[in-house]
From Swiss-Prot:
Its EC number is 3.1.-.-. It comes from the Bacteria. This is Ribonuclease Y. One of its GO terms (cellular component) is plasma membrane. The chain crosses the membrane at residues 3-23. It comes from Bacteroides fragilis (strain ATCC 25285 / DSM 2151 / CCUG 4856 / JCM 11019 / LMG 10263 / NCTC 9343 / Onslow / VPI 2553 / EN-2).
Length: 511
C-alpha cells in the first residue's frame, strides 16, 4: 500500500515535471512566433510611416516652392511698377521744368508788355485830360456836371422804357385774365340774390294811446326804470304820439325789450315784478330763436358738423349789422358766392361755403374787443376745432395774417363782392363825408396834382394833374402810387378806381 502511494506520488511528480517542461517549450515557441509577427508588423508600420512622412515633406516642399515663386512674382511686379512710376515721375519732372521755363519766358514777356501798356495809359490819361479840358472850355460845363446831366437823361429814358414794358405786361395780363375773372365773378353774383337790411341803433315801439304810455311809465317812472334795468336798453318816452323809442347798440337787447313790451301791453299787467318775469321769459325765447336761426341757416346751406356754440354765434348774426348790411344775410351771401367761385376754380365748394359762412363770426362776441374781428373769428374757429385752411381763410380775409390756403383769397373776394354790391351797405353821413375828404386830400399830397374829385360814393377818385409838371408816362405811375397809398392808409368797402387826367389846352386869338 505504501509502495503504491509512493509510486503514485513519484508518477505525479514526474508527470508534473514533464508537463512543465512541455508547457515551457510550447510557450517559448509561441512567444517566438508572436515576436516575429510583431517585428514584421513593426517593420511594415515603419515603412508606411516613412513613406507618409516623405510624402508630406514632398508636398510641403512643393507648396513652399509655389509660395516662394508667387512672392518672387509679386516682388517682380512691384519692382516693375516702381520702375514705371519712376519713369513717369521723371517725365513729369522734365515737363514741369519745361513749363516753368515757358512760364518764366511768358512772365518776362508780360512784364515787358505791361510796361508798354503803362506808358500808353499814361499817354492816354494825358490826352483824355487835355480833351476834357477842351470839352469843358467849349461846353461851359465841368465833367461832373456833364455826368449828372447824362445820368439824368439815362434815368428818364430808362423810366420811360420800363413804364412801356410794364404797360405791355399789364395789358397782356388783363387780356388773358380779365375775361375769365369777369365770367367767374359775374356768374357768382348772378347766382346769388339776398335782401338788403338797414342798420339802426333804435327801435320804435308803437302803442295805441297815451294812456298805455302812462301805464308803461308807471308811478314816478318805476316801470320804466325796472324795464331799463332788466333789459339794458334806454327807453325814451317823449311827446311823439303813439310811440316809444328803444335805444341800444345791442340789437339783441332791443329785440328783448320790444318783445317784452309787446307782451306786457297785451297782457295789461305792468309792474316791476311782472316786468322782470316777462323779460326773463322773453330772453329765453330769444336765445332759443337764436339757436333755431343758426340751425336753420346751416341746414339751408347744407353745412354740417358745426360746434353748437358756432351755431349760436351764427344765429346771433341775425341781430347784427355792418355798414347797414345785416350780418347773417351778408354771411349767407358770402357763403353762396364762395361755393360758386370755388366750383368754377375746381376747389371744394363745401369747404368754401363753410369758410364764407364763418368769416365774420368775430363780429358777434363781445369779449376781446381789442382784436380785429378777423383774428377773433380765427381764434373762435380754432377753439371749436375747425380745419386749419378754414381758420386761415377767416383770419386772412382782411390781410391781418398771411394767406396759406386757397380758400383765403376766395373768401376775401366774395366778402368784398357782397359788401360792395350796390344797396348792400350804407354809412353814417359824417363818416361818409370824412372818407371822401380823406380820399381827396390823400391824392392832393402828390406833387403835380391840381384838383381831386371823389365821385360815385367814394368808389372812384379822379385826379387832375398839371400838363407842364407830369407827362403821359408819369400819370400811370401816379395812379399806381395813389392806389397803393389808399390801400395802406384807408379802410373802405369794395374797391376804389383811380383815374388820373392830364389835359393840355392851347388858346390863341385871331385879331
Amino acid at each position: 500500500m505504501l509502495v503504491t502511494i509512493v509510486a503514485s506520488i513519484a508518477c505525479f511528480i514526474v508527470g508534473g515535471i514533464l508537463s512543465y517542461v512541455l508547457f515551457k517549450y510550447g510557450l517559448k515557441a509561441k512567444y517566438d512566433n508572436v515576436l516575429k509577427e510583431a517585428e514584421t508588423e513593426a517593420e511594415v508600420i515603419k515603412k508606411n510611416k516613412l513613406l507618409e512622412v516623405k510624402e508630406k515633406f514632398l508636398n510641403k516642399k512643393a507648396d513652399l516652392e509655389k509660395e516662394v515663386a508667387l512672392r518672387n512674382q509679386k516682388i517682380q511686379q512691384a519692382e516693375n511698377k516702381l520702375k514705371q512710376r519712376e519713369m513717369v515721375l521723371s517725365q513729369r519732372q522734365e515737363e514741369i521744368q519745361r513749363k516753368r521755363a515757358e512760364a518764366d519766358a511768358v512772365r518776362e514777356n508780360l512784364e515787358a508788355q505791361l510796361g508798354i501798356v503803362d506808358k500808353k495809359k499814361e499817354e492816354l490819361d494825358k490826352l483824355q485830360h487835355q480833351e476834357i479840358e477842351k470839352l469843358e472850355a467849349l461846353s461851359g460845363l465841368s465833367a461832373d456836371e456833364a455826368k449828372e446831366r447824362l445820368v439824368e437823361s439815362l434815368k428818364e429814358e430808362a423810366k420811360t422804357q420800363a413804364q412801356s414794358y410794364i404797360n405791355d405786361i399789364m395789358d397782356d395780363a388783363k387780356l388773358t385774365a380779365s375775361k375769365e375773372a369777369k365770367r367767374i365773378v359775374i356768374q357768382s353774383i348772378q347766382r346769388v340774390a339776398t335782401e338788403t337790411a338797414i342798420e339802426n341803433s333804435v327801435t320804435v315801439f308803437h302803442i295805441e294811446s297815451d294812456e298805455i304810455k302812462g301805464r308803461i311809465i308807471g308811478r314816478e317812472g318805476r316801470n320804466i326804470r325796472a324795464l331799463e334795468a332788466a333789459t339794458g336798453v334806454e327807453i325814451v318816452v317823449d311827446d311823439t304820439p303813439e310811440a316809444i323809442v328803444l335805444s341800444a347798440f345791442d340789437p339783441v337787447r332791443r329785440e328783448i325789450a320790444r318783445l317784452a313790451l309787446h307782451q306786457l301791453v297785451t297782457d295789461g299787467r305792468i309792474h316791476p315784478a311782472r316786468i322782470e318775469e316777462v323779460v326773463a321769459k322773453v330772453r329765453k325765447q330769444v336765445e332759443e330763436e337764436i339757436i333755431e336761426t343758426g340751425k336753420r341757416t346751416t341746414i339751408d346751406l347744407g353745412i354740417h358738423g358745426l360746434h353748437p356754440e358756432l351755431i349760436r354765434i351764427i344765429g346771433k348774426m341775425k341781430y347784427r349789422s355792418s355798414y347797414g348790411q345785416n350780418l347773417l344775410q351778408h354771411a349767407r351771401e358770402t357763403a353762396n358766392l364762395c361755393a360758386v367761385m370755388a366750383s368754377e376754380l375746381g376747389l371744394n365748394p363745401k369747404k368754401a361755403k363753410r369758410a364764407g359762412l364763418l368769416h365774420d363770426i368775430g363780429k358777434v362776441p363781445d369779449e376781446e374787443p381789442e382784436l380785429p374781428h378777423a383774428l377773433l373769428g380765427m381764434k373762435l374757429a380754432e377753439k371749436f376745432k375747425e380745419k386749419p385752411d378754414i381758420c386761415n381763410a377767416i383770419g386772412a380775409h382782411h390781410d391781418e395774417i398771411e394767406m396759406t390756403s386757397l380758400l383765403a383769397p376766395i373768401v376775401q373776394v366774395c366778402d368784398a363782392i357782397s359788401g360792395a354790391r350796390p344797396g348792400a351797405r350804407r354809412e353814417i353821413v359824417e363818416a361818409y363825408i370824412k372818407r371822401l375828404n380823406d380820399l381827396e386830400q390823400l391824392a392832393m399830397s402828390y406833387p403835380g396834382v391840381t384838383k381831386t374829385y371823389a365821385i360815385q360814393a367814394g368808389r372812384e377818385l379822379r385826379v387832375i394833374v398839371g400838363a407842364d409838371k407830369i407827362d403821359d408816362k408819369q400819370t400811370e405811375n401816379l395812379s399806381g402810387e395813389i392806389a397803393k397809398k389808399i390801400q395802406d392808409e384807408m379802410t373802405y368797402p369794395g374797391q376804389v378806381k383811380i383815374t388820373v387826367i392830364r389835359e393840355t389846352r392851347a388858346v390863341s386869338f385871331a385879331k
